Structure formats: structure tokens, C-alpha cells
């Protein structure tokens, strides 16, 4: 008897022998962000889905990290394969409480101390917006994807997706300051050849975007000021 996972692994290994690298660049336009006006085009998630919808991916446990450091989530934008467990280590001298009540995954990992970590498994594709229940300025985005063929753009807008088997795909993008209509219009079919395939430059408009207003995990407004002396572990 030949086990199905052996067949799948063999096919993946064979595909990797002729796999290509997909490269390209993004540019952000119509932006009110100072960083974008300074030509910082980082944080755009680009991925490929097989045009025929058929995709076999290995059922291996994968993990990723989103740090909490200097009252920020690092990285601010994270892309992972569906089924990935994301760790949220607390590298600050104060407590944090990461949570999400948007789209891809609703979770609340609770209040936890400096130097500790908690995790959540993101098991279905979607966009997960992450916040802290204590610090209203902390936010991040996790793109949970149905495919292992993805990349996040660098500051210069360049991206590179390695190990893509030749074939027909649909290229999709997610950017935290673009509307759903803009992102949908950017979806395009792409034929990947062996070796390197270069995607035409992708221009993403931020016009029409409205900042996501969020409340705390209880659905209430954050206090106007937060005195961190109330939280164990805070520096006095």
C-alpha cells in the first residue's frame, strides 16, 4: 500500500525541482501617510493561488512570531499559511493583551506578564487585525493565506516569491490601507514559467480608505489616558 502523504510529498519534491521565483514591485499612491510619501512601500502582502483551485500543501506544523516590543507589534504586517500557530512574546516591561475581533480569527489571549508568551492557531484564510486591550495605539495585520506562495514587500516595494511550480495562477494582494474594491480590482491571472517570472509593477491606491476604528475587547472605548502603573511589571 502506498500512503497518500507519500504520493503528495513526492509530487511536491518533483515540483520543487522545476520551481520558479516570482518577482515584482508595488507602489503606493494617493496616500496621506508621511512614510509612504517618503517612498516606503513596505507591508504589502502578495500571494499566488492556482487558477484551477487545486493545491496540495504539506500538513506540517508551522509557527511564526509577532513580538510585542516598545508598545508595538513586530512585524506590523505578517503573512502566514493557514494552520500556522502565531506566538506573541511580550518583550516589554509591562503587561499586554493581544486580541482580534475582525474577520479571519476572533481570539483573546488574555493579560500576560513581561518575558512570557502566548499563542493562537490561525486555522482559516482571512485578514486578522490584531490589537492590544491595554494600549489603543498598538495594531497589526496578519494575512492568513490558503497557499504557501506569498511574500511581503520590502521598503523599496520589491517582493520575491520563491519555489513556485510552473503553471497558471491568480495573483492577489492585501494592503492595510486599501479598500476591498481596490484590492479586488488588482487580482490578475499570471502564468509562471520555469526559472524567474517578473510581474508588472503593481500600483495600489489608498484613496477612499478610512482608518479602522476599534474598541477594546469588551466593545467599549479605551480610557482617554492609560496609567501603566496599574499594570504589574510596569516601570515606575
Regions found by a protein language model. Name each.
Residues 19-236:
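Extracytoplasmic copper-binding redox domains, predominantly the cupredoxin/blue-copper superfamily
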Residues 2-16:
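Bacterial N-terminal signal peptides
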Amino acid at each position: 500500500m502506498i500512503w497518500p502523504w507519500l504520493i503528495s510529498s513526492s509530487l511536491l519534491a518533483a515540483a520543487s525541482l522545476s520551481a520558479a521565483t516570482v518577482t515584482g514591485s508595488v507602489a503606493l499612491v494617493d496616500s496621506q501617510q508621511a512614510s509612504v510619501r517618503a517612498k516606503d512601500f513596505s507591508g504589502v502582502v502578495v500571494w499566488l493561488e492556482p487558477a484551477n483551485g487545486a493545491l496540495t500543501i504539506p500538513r506540517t506544523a508551522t509557527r511564526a512570531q509577532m513580538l510585542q516590543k516598545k508598545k508595538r507589534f513586530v512585524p506590523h504586517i505578517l503573512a502566514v499559511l493557514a494552520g500556522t500557530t502565531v506566538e506573541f512574546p511580550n518583550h516589554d516591561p509591562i503587561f499586554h493583551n493581544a486580541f482580534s475581533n475582525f474577520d479571519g480569527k476572533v481570539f483573546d489571549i488574555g493579560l500576560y506578564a513581561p518575558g512570557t508568551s502566548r499563542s493562537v492557531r490561525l486555522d482559516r484564510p482571512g485578514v486578522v487585525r490584531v490589537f492590544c486591550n491595554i494600549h489603543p495605539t498598538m495594531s497589526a495585520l496578519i494575512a492568513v493565506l490558503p497557499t504557501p506562495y506569498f511574500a511581503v514587500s520590502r521598503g523599496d516595494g520589491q517582493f520575491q516569491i520563491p519555489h513556485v511550480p510552473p503553471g497558471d495562477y491568480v495573483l492577489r494582494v492585501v494592503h492595510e490601507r486599501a479598500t476591498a474594491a481596490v484590492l479586488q480590482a488588482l487580482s490578475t491571472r499570471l502564468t509562471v514559467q520555469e526559472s524567474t517570472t517578473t510581474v508588472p509593477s503593481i500600483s495600489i491606491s489608498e484613496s477612499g480608505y478610512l482608518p479602522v476604528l476599534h474598541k477594546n475587547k469588551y466593545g467599549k472605548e479605551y480610557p482617554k489616558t492609560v496609567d501603566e502603573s496599574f499594570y504589574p511589571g510596569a516601570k515606575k
